[in-house]
């Protein structure tokens, strides 16, 4: 059992026969009245998102989630295929289950697939990935008085903000949890 006050992004729990993962949370302590936890939850099976409020002392049943490292193979336009490195079994996943991670995954990269009762429900990209910048505007000399950022499109199609000294064709390291530029490689 976990208390609602301990909910964090990514926590998975069971409630009313359904399994939810926390997409976003906010601990609220109003000046008057009792504290509460406002959450945005995603049903791991249906993919639907709901807003729910909990009392911080409420107890929730923690869900048993299996995490397995698998290799991203390819996409056929509708489904994304991942392969288990031990059994070489391939599993197809629809976009709704990979949308958070796919913008940072190239073919043959490894990712963590989360399973609940044998059914895959989420993909987690590695914390840091190295990707090539395919398009960005050139930096202008003299724009260095402050920390100036510009948008850059990566080889996977993701758009991140990078410093003005990063040029097209360079490889950069990106934190996939926040989508932020870390450094040039």
UniProtKB/Swiss-Prot annotation:
<dbReference type="InterPro" id="IPR001059">
    <property type="entry name" value="Transl_elong_P/YeiP_cen"/>
</dbReference>
<keyword id="KW-0251">Elongation factor</keyword>
<dbReference type="InterPro" id="IPR013185">
    <property type="entry name" value="Transl_elong_KOW-like"/>
</dbReference>
<comment type="function">
    <text>Involved in peptide bond synthesis. Stimulates efficient translation and peptide-bond synthesis on native or reconstituted 70S ribosomes in vitro. Probably functions indirectly by altering the affinity of the ribosome for aminoacyl-tRNA, thus increasing their reactivity as acceptors for peptidyl transferase.</text>
</comment>
<dbReference type="Pfam" id="PF08207">
    <property type="entry name" value="EFP_N"/>
</dbReference>
<dbReference type="InterPro" id="IPR012340">
    <property type="entry name" value="NA-bd_OB-fold"/>
</dbReference>
<keyword id="KW-0963">Cytoplasm</keyword>
<keyword id="KW-0648">Protein biosynthesis</keyword>
<dbReference type="InterPro" id="IPR013852">
    <property type="entry name" value="Transl_elong_P/YeiP_CS"/>
</dbReference>
<dbReference type="GO" id="GO:0003746">
    <property type="term" value="F:translation elongation factor activity"/>
</dbReference>
<dbReference type="InterPro" id="IPR015365">
    <property type="entry name" value="Elong-fact-P_C"/>
</dbReference>
<dbReference type="Pfam" id="PF01132">
    <property type="entry name" value="EFP"/>
</dbReference>
<dbReference type="Pfam" id="PF09285">
    <property type="entry name" value="Elong-fact-P_C"/>
</dbReference>
<dbReference type="GO" id="GO:0005737">
    <property type="term" value="C:cytoplasm"/>
</dbReference>
<dbReference type="InterPro" id="IPR020599">
    <property type="entry name" value="Transl_elong_fac_P/YeiP"/>
</dbReference>
<dbReference type="InterPro" id="IPR011768">
    <property type="entry name" value="Transl_elongation_fac_P"/>
</dbReference>
<comment type="similarity">
    <text>Belongs to the elongation factor P family.</text>
</comment>
<protein>
    <recommendedName>
        <fullName>Elongation factor P</fullName>
    </recommendedName>
</protein>
<dbReference type="InterPro" id="IPR014722">
    <property type="entry name" value="Rib_uL2_dom2"/>
</dbReference>
<dbReference type="GO" id="GO:0043043">
    <property type="term" value="P:peptide biosynthetic process"/>
</dbReference>
<dbReference type="InterPro" id="IPR008991">
    <property type="entry name" value="Translation_prot_SH3-like_sf"/>
</dbReference>
<comment type="pathway">
    <text>Protein biosynthesis; polypeptide chain elongation.</text>
</comment>
């Amino acid at each position: 059992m976990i208390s609602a006050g301990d909910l964090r992004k990514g926590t998975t729990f069971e409630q009313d026969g359904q399994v939810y993962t926390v997409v976003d949370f906010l601990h609220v302590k109003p000046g008057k009245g009792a504290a509460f936890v406002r959450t945005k939850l995603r049903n791991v099976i249906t993919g639907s998102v709901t807003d729910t409020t909990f009392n911080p002392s409420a107890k929730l049943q923690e869900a048993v989630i299996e995490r397995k490292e698998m290799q991203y193979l390819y996409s056929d336009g509708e489904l994304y295929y991942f392969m288990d490195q031990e059994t070489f079994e391939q599993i197809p996943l629809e976009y709704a289950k990979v949308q958070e991670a796919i913008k940072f995954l190239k073919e043959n990269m490894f990712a963590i697939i989360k399973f609940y009762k044998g059914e895959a429900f989420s993909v987690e990209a590695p914390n840091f990935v190295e990707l090539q910048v395919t398009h960005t505007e050139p930096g202008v000399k003299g724009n260095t008085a402050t920390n100036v950022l510009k948008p850059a499109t990566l080889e996977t199609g993701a758009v991140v903000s990078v410093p003005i000294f990063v040029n097209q064709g360079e490889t950069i390291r990106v934190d996939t949890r926040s989508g932020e530029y870390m450094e040039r490689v």
